[in-house]
Regions:
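Cysteine endopeptidase catalytic domains of the caspase/legumain-like
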Residues: 3-448
């Protein structure tokens, strides 16, 4: 046989061996005999209008639980103001789909009320018991190690580079270094994020989530669009779920988690969610692993979802949820007194939506009322790269205009892209801050 042919054959065999070795090495990183599954489930909102967020998280808990992840390795963070809320006619109950089961029973109350905040979340995720206890937390954390798989499900409002909590923001630039440090410190074998929030794709975009640290993330929306609520319930007078969350959980409820891969679940969720663009980030090879490697491997009785309505049919943008709920309630008002009360609340909601004018004033002042630039700032949606400027101006706006209640004002958050544009246009941070202070002094809405 000619030498050149022998060399070619040797190279081909070597390549096959290397590819096979890489393939085997990747899949041998599943939790071994000592490896464990951990889950951190977070609903970052409060208030009955946000019923759906805690419903999503409670449903996620039930999935993890029935597939064998024990309570000591499931951490739940939610304000817990829904199940027994005065507006909830079915006390002690939370459902995530029309006529669905009560998903509230058994859910651990690990972190509730004011303990649902960004700092607590980051410390819990990193397994920092002492730091958590120093903030009067329970001490229950994700105590994962190098052989473990960690699943994080976050549900709330969002904005460019931001995830909301009841009173504060979690910035992508706070989450990213924590995740990178966890990878460096061997705090997991694999880490998976499922994130339900508006503009959630911006949390992992660019170099915020590298593709070589064993982390995989999927998000409900891209970096520039809203996520959607679904399943308005006439009896409960609120939305029961969010489209992306409902889609992946209804899939997990009915399939064999030990055969379906994360990539397959992503594809199903992406296809079925036609209200926003479901995205994936990070190490996409992790998608070849089964869903059970992160949501639990024990077999469970499949749920028949064939009679559940399509969540896309009544889907509404997250920022329009409160307005939509009030309009639905107004249609069903039983008395003039009830109708008047709802109309008064509607007026307040409309006033809140008018906060866009506040943003316009900030922009106009910051660019010296140059009409072209002002229009451009409201037309473009630039990728966020100037994180330092952006974080500074967002936090300053929250401080000087507390009346906006920004962390829970989803409509105002939809216009944070204007602040992104200012920073990306290299407008000096101090100029933007000064403009905010001037507008805040002239705007009654900004006062508490």
């Amino acid at each position: 046989m000619a030498p050149t042919i022998l060399i070619s054959l040797a190279l081909a065999v070597s390549c096959c061996v290397l590819i096979q070795a890489d393939f085997v090495d990747f899949f041998e990183q599943k939790p071994n005999e000592d490896g464990k599954h951990w889950a951190l489930l977070v609903a970052g909102s409060s208030g009955y209008y946000n019923y759906r967020h805690q419903a999503d998280v409670c449903h996620a808990y039930q999935i993890m639980k029935k597939h064998g992840i024990p309570d000591e390795r499931i951490v739940v963070m939610m304000v817990d103001d829904i199940a027994h809320n005065i507006e909830n006619p079915d006390k002690g109950s939370i459902i995530n789909q029309p006529n669905g089961p009560n998903v509230y029973p058994g859910v651990p109350k690990d972190y509730t009320h004011e303990k649902v905040n960004p700092k607590m979340f980051l410390e819990v995720l990193q397994g920092n018991v002492e730091a958590v206890k120093s903030m009067n937390g329970s001490g229950k954390v994700i105590n994962s190690g190098p052989n473990d798989h960690v699943f994080v499900n976050f549900v709330d409002h969002g904005a460019p580079g931001i995830l909301g909590f009841p009173r504060e923001f979690l910035h992508a630039t706070q989450l990213s270094p924590v995740v990178k440090k966890m990878a460096k410190d061997n705090k997991f074998a694999k880490l998976v994020f499922y994130v339900e929030a508006c503009e959630s794709g911006s949390i992992f975009a660019g170099d915020l989530l590298p593709d070589n640290i064993n982390v995989f993330a999927t998000t409900a929306a891209n970096a520039h669009e809203s996520s959607y609520a679904c399943y308005f319930d006439n009896h409960l007078k609120t939305y029961l779920g969010d489209v992306y969350s409902v889609m992946w959980m209804q899939d997990s409820d009915k399939v064999n988690l030990n055969t379906e891969t994360l990539s397959k679940q992503f594809d199903i969720t992406k296809k079925e969610t036609n209200t926003s663009h479901v995205m994936e980030f990070g190490d996409l090879k992790i998608g070849q692993l089964t869903v059970g490697e992160f949501q639990g491997k024990s077999m469970a009785v499949a749920v028949d979802n064939s009679q559940v309505p399509n969540p896309n049919l009544d889907a509404v943008k997250s920022e329009d949820v409160k307005l939509s709920i009030l309009e639905q309630r107004l249609l069903r008002a039983q008395s003039e007194e009830e109708k008047e009360a709802i109309e008064n609340e509607l007026e307040i909601v409309v006033a809140v939506k008018n906060t866009i004018s506040t943003f316009k004033n900030i922009i106009a002042t910051a660019v010296n009322h140059q009409l072209y630039h002002t229009q451009m700032m409201f037309t473009l949606k630039r990728p966020l790269t100037q994180h330092t400027c952006y974080k500074t101006v967002v936090e300053h706006l929250k401080t000087v205009c507390p009346g906006m209640n920004l962390p829970q004002n989803d409509f105002a958050m939809r216009h944070f892209y204007t602040l992104v544009n200012l920073c990306e246009e290299q407008v000096v941070t101090d100029v933007i801050v000064d403009a905010m202070e001037k507008v805040a002094m002239e705007t009654k809405f900004c006062s508490v």
